[in-house]
Amino acid sequence: MSAIDCIITAAGLSSRMGQWKMMLPWEQGTILDTSIKNALQFCSRIILVTGYRGNELHERYANQSNITIIHNPDYAQGLLTSVKAAVPAVQTEHCFLTHGDMPTLTIDIFRKIWSLRNDGAILPLHNGIPGHPILVSKPCLMQAIQRPNVTNMRQALLMGDHYSVEIENAEIILDIDTPDDFITAKERYTEI
């Protein structure tokens, strides 16, 4: 395990799913449980950003010493507000950024992206499609959240020092946004 923070955003409404996806069953827990567990195989601490149903997540994870919970009251204004809420809690020179609905990221993916670290941002792609986790230096992260007139984190990072890297693991682009996505992902990545 490396001394590195990982921001995991879990604040959204899951509106396309039709139900709250963070607590959908996955392996022996939930999608979010598995996303956190997988990140902690490589990272030393999770900065979990909550919003919608934040009290439930606080109750579930508050007693875990390697999870810092940040509530984003502005979560309805978009993902960028969640990252901005988390940044003051970052204590390491680099940090990963990912989402709570990415339960298939493995330690090997984190390790591979970590090995490419530099003073900017490492933006992983799979077949040209942007994915996660993103790795970013703390100075680069601070600059990104202060950029005016940006609507998302990737856009803010693209305006600074960044390196796009092709990764062969399709898991970095796995999106669980709809019921069909969930069924397909469970069939492909879990033992039912």
Curated annotation (Swiss-Prot):
InterPro entries, sorted: Mo_hydrolase_YgfJ, MobA-like_NTP_Trfase, Nucleotide-diphossugar_trans
Cofactor(s) required for function per UniProt: Mg(2+); Mn(2+)
Catalytic activity as recorded in UniProt: Mo-molybdopterin + CTP + H(+) = Mo-molybdopterin cytosine dinucleotide + diphosphate
GO biological process: Mo(VI)-molybdopterin cytosine dinucleotide biosynthetic process; Mo-molybdopterin cofactor biosynthetic process
Enzyme's top EC category: transferase
Molecular-function GO term, any one: nucleotide binding
Function: Transfers a CMP moiety from CTP to Mo-molybdopterin (Mo-MPT) cofactor (Moco or molybdenum cofactor) to form Mo-molybdopterin cytosine dinucleotide (Mo-MCD) cofactor. Is specific for CTP; other nucleotides such as ATP and GTP cannot be utilized. Is also able to convert MPT to MCD in the absence of molybdate, however, with only one catalytic turnover.
Domains (record comment): The N-terminal domain determines nucleotide recognition and specific binding, while the C-terminal domain determines the specific binding to the target protein. When the N-terminal domain of MobA is fused to the C-terminal domain of MocA, comparable kinetic constants as wild-type MobA are obtained with GTP, and the activity with CTP is completely lost. Consistent results are obtained when the N-terminal domain of MocA is fused to the C-terminal domain of MobA: the kinetic constants with CTP are comparable with the ones found for wild-type MocA, although no activity with GTP is detected.
Protein name: Molybdenum cofactor cytidylyltransferase
Species of the source: Escherichia coli (strain K12)
